[in-house]
Amino acid sequence: MLKRTPLFAVYERYGAKTIDFGGWELPVQFSSIKEEHEAVRTRAGLFDVSHMGEFVVKGDDSLAFLQKMMTNDVSKLTDGRVQYSLMCYEDGGTVDDLLIYKKADGHYLLVVNAANIEKDFEWLHGHLFGDVELVNISQEIAQLALQGPLAEQVLQKLTNTDLSAIKFFSFQDDININGVKALVSRTGYTGEDGFEIYCRREDAVALWESILEAGKEEGVLPCGLGARDTLRFEATLPLYGQELSKDITPIEAGLGFAVKTNKDADFIGKDVLKKQKEEGTARKLVGIEMIDKGIPRHGYKVFANGEEIGFVTTGTQSPTLKKNIGLALIKTEFTEMDTEVEVEIRGKRLKAKVIATPFYKRAK
């Protein structure tokens, strides 16, 4: 039986096509991936991301605990701020990437990937020490993401809280949005400005409908996982299971900015990651653009001079750039800009070249 979010009941009304995504029955699209993608890049789109996991970490030793588990320096977080981090195994492979919200000293909220909820909880639970309480509240929380250049304008209609005061990677708790109490965070997974909004499960439908109603004039569309994927891909934001996995380290994936090997605390995987930061890695994640006609897809093999040098992690026809592009994890010696490589598509090796990432960056 597939898991469903509290918004499942209203999907049909908005014409959703659902798919099985990591054990969840979720909308891949409402109108079309292209239309939804375009809406987020130019106006705004609303996503149901209630499948994501939320854990509360509380107690006097919670900072010391998180410092041991996280690659980033959690001690740098101040109240009301958000931090991107990763958890790694001893060998540097990735357990998950996640967001850490600091509510107060000794009180944090972790937001993890849906497919990793059980694994992450067990991983954290297995390393608990001292005065730390770890609670999985994923079942109680719904999460909506309103993303795009007009996101603030739309959401502001529903609240008296000044949303412009919530800066990037900051949040405010207990905001009243059209009668619904929510945590509002200026974060997202699209490369655009926008908010991720956390509320109680039972308030999800009311919140969803009031945001779409408020955004009618601006052309806000309900959006599915298809557009979420093409948007995050263009912005070169990693997806666990593709750019990151137990076999791929954050350094290989180009996420060294979130790995603080110089922080005071020791963390799991530190030795390997420190070495990789200092000495480099044998393979690296790069952008590729097809020269020949073809679309690179996840898992396709990449070749150079007749030898296999890696594989595509994500690829698609970019709706914004109108080009066939991909992210590929390949041997470091082939990662210089404009290096010609080949992608094996349906048994044929087709020409591509290494290009700069991110593929898309919004004008500030």
UniProtKB/Swiss-Prot annotation:
SUPFAM superfamilies: Aminomethyltransferase beta-barrel domain (SSF101790), Folate-binding domain (SSF103025). Its EC number is 2.1.2.10. Gene3D superfamilies: Aminomethyltransferase beta-barrel domains, Aminomethyltransferase fragment, Probable tRNA modification gtpase trme, domain 1. One of its GO terms (biological process) is glycine decarboxylation via glycine cleavage system. Keywords: Aminotransferase, Transferase. It catalyses: N(6)-[(R)-S(8)-aminomethyldihydrolipoyl]-L-lysyl-[protein] + (6S)-5,6,7,8-tetrahydrofolate = N(6)-[(R)-dihydrolipoyl]-L-lysyl-[protein] + (6R)-5,10-methylene-5,6,7,8-tetrahydrofolate + NH4(+). GO terms for molecular function: aminomethyltransferase activity; transaminase activity. Transmembrane segments: none annotated. GO terms for cellular component: cytosol; glycine cleavage complex. InterPro entries: GCS_T (IPR006223), GCS_T_bac (IPR022903), GCST_C (IPR013977), GCV_T_N (IPR006222), GcvT/YgfZ/DmdA (IPR028896), GcvT/YgfZ_C (IPR029043), TrmE/GcvT_dom1 (IPR027266). It comes from the Bacteria. It holds the Pfam family GCV_T_C. The glycine cleavage system catalyzes the degradation of glycine. Belongs to the GcvT family. The glycine cleavage system is composed of four proteins: P, T, L and H. This is Aminomethyltransferase.
